[in-house]
Amino acid sequence: SAEIARQLFDSAFQTEMGYTPVTMPCLFIPETYQVYWDMSVDDFFKRMQTEHKRFWNDERLAQATAIGMTPEEVCTLASIVEEETNNNEEKPIVAGLYINRLHQDMPLQADPTIKFALQDFGLRRITNEHLKVNSPYNTYINTGLPPGPIRIPSKKGIDSVLNYTKHNYIYMCAKEDFSGTHNFASNYADHMANARKYWKALNERK
């Protein structure tokens, strides 16, 4: 409702809930909820808090601590992972790749953050001009995580970060079969070989 939207963007309310304007989406855990049409705004947010605490149980909080992240940081990384791949089996691998980059103080270089910075998720190809956008969400020019999530991640997305796959990958490129999955690489030479395969397939597709 409009009342819920107003409350969401109220800075005093955000602070009271323990969030900032950019981390507020982390409150919400996607699920099918049964709510009544006459539920008050306060009751709605109390319900969301209850569901958030239920999801972020002691086990998940311990997992977040073990990987050196707050729940908000996990949520932020999960939002990027889910924009990179729809493949649930691949999500922990992508999460592991970004965590490797964070540990090496490398920019994440995540294209979805550029789309978010430009507020254009319909962009099909990111150009060098797009990479110059002046935004804290530009993970090509800034290291570390962006200030907050670029979407509300699913439970699977969050769990893929908490249970990320350990490997040496720091690069990925869309597969040349256009399956929506990726080829991964631990060095730039292998990454460029993967990229050439993809570009060749892309040019042949035109």
Predicted regions and their residues:
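Bacterial extracytoplasmic/cell-wall-associated proteins, especially those involved in peptidoglycan
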Residues: 5-6, 10-206
